[in-house]
């Protein structure tokens, strides 16, 4: 499905995952997708407990979550609190930087923002573009077209492709309407 095949409007309640705790994985020098195994911190779990009290979430029909641990742990608490069904989508993962290391990630983020989500031909770091991210999200969400309101628990860079917010805090809720 391309971006030219859109048609169904869906209310999406984006939720950024709770604060993660990377300490154990960093101590063991995990990188790449290995770092995505990080669970929520205690503060992150408290953030989700507060989030779960939001009656707005119950207006949705389903929760769709990234398969990344910090998002999935967030989604599991929200699903328990709301009673909403939970689906896990591996394609709702974090923005991809195709090189390892926190320095390379930060450089890629800077270049992504400076270049409005585009990857310049001479870029010193390779990363997923805004168009690629948006396409990945829309293709993934197409299977939920029968739902009018969906909670999507995902990651800041992915959410930013659909909302104007510069800063998206842990467990922040942002509602928008998206054509799927």
Residue ranges and their predicted role:
Residues 72, 135-180:
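Active-site-adjacent alpha-helix immediately C-terminal to a catalytic or transition-state-stabilizing loop
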Residues 21, 95, 159:
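Flexible, glycine-rich phosphate/dinucleotide-binding loops
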Residues 2-6, 142-145:
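A short acidic-Thr-Gly-centered motif at the start of a beta-strand
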Residues 3, 11-87, 172-174:
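Active-site-proximal alpha-helix that buttresses catalytic centers in soluble enzyme cores
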